Regions:
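Small/aliphatic-rich secondary-structure junction motif
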Residues: 1-54, 160-225, 245, 273, ...
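General small-molecule cofactor/ligand-binding pocket signal
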Residues: 34-36, 90-94, 145, 190-192, ...
Length: 286
């Protein structure tokens, strides 16, 4: 897998569990993590080079100190049950805005996954949604792992993969990606088709359905379910709860999340209100 990007802020507790998830994914998928912290230094025309360098060093020191606290939390709470696979860290402490630097790093580096926590602050969640919606990530096919507010890491034993069975570009690659994730975490997969009514999709005529059937026939830990319900959020949350899901996975369509039934507002609501982490993969543009 490509590198994992973990943007973080200073003295914000929502990043602790998000950091744990980022490290777990980096360890299990055997990839490097980029730790990104941004800051703004306002300097007048009369500032000297030495003073500016001192301001930069002070910001770097604070960022390194924050990383130390995140590592301490991880080691105290989670390292006992982890394998000791060493992962590499790439530190990026940059004078700039977080949103723009996330885009710059994703554009310039081989980033495959960005880990973002949900906050109880509306302005922060608004920024997170702007990141989720940005077309840069569609062009670069960067996936997003959204960690729920007050979420606590749990082993990923059950993955729920949402699908409307509509054929997307290169859909087999997404199926392979979720299988790769399941193998890395030794997880079960529930391929779940949620429809607003019984006649929405003719399963047998769907290439996606046929491909999923091939997958489930090869592995008894991978199953397919079909749910009928007008309230998408309620149906998803109920299924997640009933089946002890630890990760929710879905494809963001080029235009809308799972095109019609899973439209943009549903994307936002699932991302911000899910009780389990949501992995959003992007449809590849032709």
């Amino acid at each position: 897998m490509k590198q994992i990007l973990f943007p973080f802020e200073i003295d914000n507790p929502i990043y602790k569990e998000a950091y744990v998830y980022a490290v777990k994914f980096a360890r299990n998928l055997n990839t490097q993590m980029i730790l990104l912290n941004t800051f703004i230094i306002t300097a007048g025309n009369d500032i000297t080079k030495d003073k500016y360098s001192k301001l930069i060093r002070n910001k770097w020191f604070k960022a390194y100190n924050e990383v130390s606290k995140l590592n301490k939390y991880y080691l105290e709470e989670h390292a006992r049950t982890d394998n000791q696979l060493i992962i590499k860290f790439d530190y990026r402490f940059i004078n700039g805005t977080l949103k723009e630097e996330i885009k710059n790093v994703a554009r310039e580096d081989a980033v495959g996954l960005i880990v973002l926590p949900v906050s109880d602050r509306k302005e922060m969640n608004k920024r997170q949604l702007e990141i989720i919606h940005d077309n840069l990530f569609e062009k670069n096919r960067v996936s997003l792992l959204v960690i729920p507010f007050k979420g606590v890491f749990k082993p990923i034993n059950n993955i729920v993969f949402l699908t409307d069975l509509k054929k997307l570009h290169h859909f087999t690659q997404y199926l392979n990606n979720v299988i790769q994730c399941a193998e890395a975490f030794d997880s079960n997969i529930h391929f779940v088709n949620i429809s607003s009514k019984e006649s929405d999709v003719n399963q047998e005529n769907s290439e996606v359905y046929q491909e999923i059937m091939k997958i489930t026939n090869k592995n008894p830990r991978y199953v397919y379910e079909r749910l009928i319900g007008n309230n998408v959020i309620e149906s998803v949350n109920q299924y997640v709860e009933n089946n002890n899901a630890d990760l929710l996975v879905a494809i963001k369509h080029q235009h809308y999340f799972l095109e019609t039934l899973f439209h943009k507002s549903i994307t936002d609501e699932i991302s911000l209100n899910s009780k389990v982490p949501v992995l959003i993969m992007r449809e590849i543009e032709d």
